[in-house]
Amino acid sequence: MIPFNKPYLTGKETHYIYEAVNSGKLSGNGIFTKRCQDFFEQRYGFKKCLLTTSCTDALEMAAILCDIQPGDEVIIPSYTFVSTALAFVRQGARIVFADSMPNHPNIDADKIEALITDRTKVIVPVHYAGVACDMDKIMTLATKYNLLVVEDAAQAIDSYYSPLPPSPLKGEQDTRYTNALQLNNPTKTPPLGGRGAGTIGHFAAFSFHETKNIISGEGGMLAINDERFIHRAEIIWEKGTNRAEFFRGEVNKYGWVDTGSSFLPSEVIAAFLWAQVEHLDMIQDKRKQLWHTYYELLKPLADKGLFILPDLPSYATNNAHMFYLVCHSLDERTALIKKLKDNDILAVFHYLSLHSSPYYNNKHDGRKLPNCDKFADCLVRLPMYYDLTKDDVKLICEVIKMKFNTI
């Protein structure tokens, strides 16, 4: 059986977990937490990173930092995981669902402005499959209407958004990435590819769930790009206390000063993640090779109109988080998944439309979201993981060709 996903282990995880266990500091915010946070801040340019126990927790922290009050409106795509909405619903927000683009599951930035009212407070673009949304358009709207932007970058670690940042002045060196390499990171420096996904909005939430490119079993991270929110974020992260200030020597004791929760992960989780971070570029290189093999082998079928392949906009890079194709009907997708399963290959569909979910359908305003519904009915995800081989990909593509009678 070729599974849909298989977690990749670098071989360093147990070594670092052992090191964490013997450090005398297991409860979190120790050496491995700091290594990971420093790495992400220096590699991508975030103002502040805080590891969390899940991406859901990172989104919930963002919702608190956005000061969501009952009745505030938050615009999100309907084609997303429930955590995107749930984090804001828990704070009392009313969710306003936006449709996807016709050719991509990402939110249609051209349809957002019509949804903005005097109660709108936040826009939450979701970078589906690691492909960035049209952030220039979204940030222009945020500035125009004084809104906050939370990037749901759960799938988008090591993705980039264009246009490219300004080049360093002549004679100067851009050290954003070389600094990261000094943090015990032996991987090569990635090429400059624009702004990192998650660095553009006020906040971004990342996932290190076992299905993601780099993993810690469960785990996430809140990235903060606006310095106004860093101080309060540390308090919320530490159960509503000013504990971080105490350990920096800024106060002589700490106490309960704000709302919050136990969002920080243990050092065991952070140690596992650090082993993955050290191999980030190697993991990315392999996944991209597999992604391009899929694309090259399936493009002739897509050119015949048998299905639709992922569309990559000119302003975004591909981090090879996922390879999917879009069938022309629900029945066709069901038949394709069955054909693959009959050949010991596990392919899966993805999200159901949140606007028609049992929990929220009676709260939705009734607008039709046809593009979202199309992806909910027709999108199928193919196996993608580090240990997948090119021969595996070729076999999968051969079965797909058999299904469409092109062999």
Features from the language model and the residues they span:
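Active-site PLP attachment segment
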Residues: T199-N242, E267
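PLP-dependent aminotransferase-like
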Residues: I64-Y160
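N-terminal "arm"/small-domain region of PLP-dependent enzymes with the aminotransferase-like
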Residues: M1-L26, G255-V257
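Phosphate-binding glycine-rich loop
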Residues: L26-E73, L86-Q91, F97-A98
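PLP-dependent aminotransferase class I/II
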Residues: K34-D38, R43-K47, D110, V122-V126, ...
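Conserved active-site segment immediately N-terminal to the catalytic lysine
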Residues: E151-S162, Y177-N185, G196-I215, E245, ...
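Structural detector of well-ordered beta-strand residues that form the stable sheet scaffold
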Residues: L50, I75, V96, V149-V150, ...
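Glycine-biased, low-complexity coil/linker segments
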Residues: K170-E172, L192-G196
